[in-house]
Amino acid sequence: VLGHVLDRNPDLALVFPDYYLVDPFGEVYSHERRKKLYVDNHSLDTPPHGACTLIRVSVLKEVGGYREDLKAQDGFDLWSKLFERYKLTNVNLPLFYYRQHGSNLTANSHRIFDARRQIKMDHIRDKLKSLHPVIAVIPCRRNFDFVTDLWDEKIGGKTLLEREIEVCLSSELFDHVVVASDNPLTEETVRKYSDDRLGFVLRDSQSTIRSASIVPTLESVVSRFSPELSGITVIRYLQAPFVKVDSIEEAIATLVMSGADSSIAVEEILSQVFRRTRYGMEPVNPRGDFRSDFDSLYRDLLCCVATYSRNFRTGSLTGRSIVSYVMPPAECMIIDTEQKLQVARVLAGGGH
């Protein structure tokens, strides 16, 4: 079937099918379907399952073949080399069975995360040279959190702000790291660091209320370095203290690689979600034997946003086109209650 598609369409470089998911006992429990590329699906940020993908040998040779230095995600690497240069397609027929069990490579998340990030960074390294400045903004506020001056709370012997500053400064991708706060005392923390990339901006207290958009603050910050609002801005929320620098850099890489307006960290919602109707509750993501990639629901982890600074001109944080990436579960904790703050202190060690 796949060979026939390539034979009839010489302009195509790659084709892939739908597939069945099979449990450890050999029972089919789901038909995984991908919406038709270029017709119903115009976002090519998600590669196909690599178990049954047909590619022209000539094209495979042109792009250098599969990488042998990767321990996982070689299919994603191949996809990253193809989707911008060649025409690809998919067939809505399930042509293979995929059995999921604990020993699948898919279950080895660390290898997958590391390989995926390496592929993305290698892919965008040259592109990033024309996208400066890359600015990290760490917003802080005195009020409107569950505790006053949340940024000054300590976990693992350091304040949340100190932890975030050090993580951002550890990345060579950032030209500037800016702390924006309505409390002048925040600047004292900033002054502890000698890195020339680090700066402080005093923001208006009215901009910190929950109903206020953060975009005017971001536009003001970025305009200091780029009046024309060029480059990329990354918003890092210190309420997520376990996010590592690799995940922050992946936000940038995902954005640049995709051609979208912004990228966010998400988590797939695996449990059922309901909405209220006139007749009671209705499932938004009904479970069944047949599902497509459009049936999945995701929640914003509120950890990190990478966006092109030009979006601020229209008052938008994300722009119209948003892509996502998955963050390791250990990094996803958000401190928005006193209880979670205490849990974070236990996880970080070192008490206050």
Locate the predicted segments by residue.
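Catalytic donor-sugar/metal-binding loop of nucleotide-sugar-dependent glycosyltransferases
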Residues: 13, 68-70, 80-97, 124-131, ...
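Short, acidic, metal-binding catalytic loop of nucleotide-sugar glycosyltransferases
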Residues: 167-174
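Short phosphate-binding loop-to-helix
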Residues: 185-234, 242-246, 250
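Conserved donor NDP-sugar-binding/catalytic core segment of glycosyltransferases
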Residues: 1-29, 225-230, 253-265
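N-terminal nucleotide-binding beta1-loop-alpha1 segment
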Residues: 129-148
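Conserved core of the sugar-phosphate nucleotidyltransferase
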Residues: 26, 216-220, 229, 238-331
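Conserved nucleotide-sugar donor-binding catalytic segment
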Residues: 17, 31-117
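Short, flexible, basic/aromatic active-site loop/helix in glycosyltransferases
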Residues: 18, 27-46, 50, 121, ...
